[in-house]
Amino acid sequence: MDKAEAHKILTEQLARFTDHAQLVPLVESQHIENCEVFGASGTRYQVEVQFFWDDAPMRAIRVVASIDDGGVRAFIPLTETLFVSPHEHTTA
């Protein structure tokens, strides 16, 4: 798996989830977003995004995205986390 390409895809996917008000229903319903994305190299990646309260309900939301190419990385996917507060967001 091309880590740079996978990281770019994760960054693009996380950018879709920065509005706290829109994320609240996803956390409350325990929604998991799954999709397949093709990288510039033609590699097919599986992306999973999960949503959690970070510390307490109605406060910061932790958005966790993971990616793999179906190979060995499927057992240990590349993962990135975004924290979205009601007023701002940060990436870890």
Please name every model-derived segment:
Residues 1-92:
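Flexible, low-complexity segments enriched in proline/glycine/serine and punctuated by aromatic residues
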